[in-house]
Amino acid sequence: MPYPLQLGFQDATSPIMEELLHFHDHTLMIVFLISSLVLYIITLMLTTKLTHTSTMDAQEVETVWTILPAVILILIALPSLRILYMMDEINNPLLTIKAMGHQWYWSYEYTDYEDLNFDSYMVPTSDLKPGELRLLEVDNRLVLPMELSIRMLISSEDVLHSWAVPSLGLKTDAIPGRLNQATLMATRPGLYYGQCSEICGSNHSFMPIVLELVPLKHFEDWSTSML
């Protein structure tokens, strides 16, 4: 989860988020090297008194600054496309959850169970218990088993919303009349917080998401108690 004065990403809790962090570091290193080179050239141009008079026709330089950017773009595009296809690939999910956005709460349905669904509202500040987080706690958490492939079906009943959990690398738009899907697999148990990430009205900031990832045995016990 985030903490005050945080400058980086949240700790990765899914394979997708780990890949996104690696891609971020890869791209940032390329940007850093380019920025350093440009800054070095600008510094040389500002500090030298020498003038090169033969740069009006420099075929070699033009060739280099045409090919080099293309190579750099390829080095960025290939890992990006790989991750993009990984995020869209859903193979044999063991559990399917349908998340519906409303103004201003989420409702969840476990489609593999006959009658397991509930609404998830934010807990008002006045009702918070010691240790709970303001604007992030909900009355009904989405309980899921860890280390299993889970398919999320996401849509909306009214306006545009966005179902986002940063530590899992998830952000999927909830669009009325359209069913979007995402894959989810957590590698560690715990509570994972997210929020609606699409401005959806006056209470947009009061639509938290709380995932409770538990071992499979605990999930089976919980689902049995809910039916």
From Swiss-Prot:
Family matches, as Gene3D superfamilies: 1.10.287.90, Cupredoxins - blue copper proteins
Needed co-factor(s): Cu cation
Gene Ontology biological-process annotations: ATP synthesis coupled electron transport
Residues binding Cu cation A2, per UniProt: 196, 198, 200, 204
EC nos: 7.1.1.9
Binding-site residues for Cu cation A1, renumbered to this chain: 161, 196, 200, 207
GO terms, molecular function: copper ion binding; cytochrome-c oxidase activity
Pfam families: COX2 (PF00116), COX2_TM (PF02790)
Role, per record: Component of the cytochrome c oxidase, the last enzyme in the mitochondrial electron transport chain which drives oxidative phosphorylation. The respiratory chain contains 3 multisubunit complexes succinate dehydrogenase (complex II, CII), ubiquinol-cytochrome c oxidoreductase (cytochrome b-c1 complex, complex III, CIII) and cytochrome c oxidase (complex IV, CIV), that cooperate to transfer electrons derived from NADH and succinate to molecular oxygen, creating an electrochemical gradient over the inner membrane that drives transmembrane transport and the ATP synthase.
Protein's UniProt name: Cytochrome c oxidase subunit 2
Gene: MT-CO2
